Structure formats: structure tokens, C-alpha cells
Amino acid sequence: MPKVKVETRKAMRIAYIEHTGDYGAIPFDRDIERLYGWAKERKVRPGFYPLGIYYDRPATTPPEKRRSEIGIPVYGDVKGDREIKTKEVPKMKVAAISFKGPASAYPAAYDALSAWVAENGYEWSGPSIEVYSKKPEKVGGQTIMYAKIEAPIRKK
């Protein structure tokens, strides 16, 4: 099992694009390009690491109903529009693991994180957050993802 760290995630403002549907079908590259372009047009300084916020568990939610947001941190006073919205993500305590692997390995990583959360007297207290530390790469026909998976937690 990957090493789990309990961390305090700082509050941040993000610009994001909402999605409903299969997590594997999110046009990640297109969205990130649009978000950074949007920030540049508005002369807003973006953060370096894009992120995904995932509201629904694949084990309990049909693919067509899964809600998510792909976003980037933004610094400065900026308002969203019809397509790209902005919001504050509050400060929170998270259980975090580093992930490097094919997208097909995400379920096992989430299972391991969920087990750690339960075994250590915590419960999930919000949607999971994935912070992408590197652009995905194609290796041997598979897409390799680089992310920190964060589970917002609170003591039971």
C-alpha cells in the first residue's frame, strides 16, 4: 500500500470546468489548455498544478451521473463566466497518497486510501481531489498518470 500522509490543504481559489459523465471521458488536456488561456486573457496568475475534484464514487454511481470539476488555482480577484466558473476551496485536512500509474490502477489506489481512512479512525468528509504533478504520458499504449490523491477527512 502506498504511504498515506495526513496533511492540511490550504484554502485556495480555483477556476474550473464542470463535467457530468464517465471520469475516463473527461477531456483533461483540452480543459487545462482552456483554463490557462482563460486566466491569461484575464491577466490572472494561475497556479502551477491543475486538479480534479471528483464528487461521486464509481462503485456507487453510474458513469453517466458522475460529477467532477477540472480546475487550476488562480490568484487574484476574478469572476467566472458561463463556461468557466470560480470558487473557493476551503482549508481542509486530507489523507494523501502519491499515484503514478495507468488510469486503470486508480480503483486500487482509491481502495487502499479508503481502507487506510477507515482503519485509522477517520471518515471521508467531501469529494476527492487529485492534484496533477506532471502531464500524463503515453507509455507502451497506456496513459500514465502522476497525481496526489487527497481524501478530505474528519475523525469519526
Tell me the role of every PLM-derived stretch.
Residues 1-156:
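A solvent-exposed interaction/effector surface
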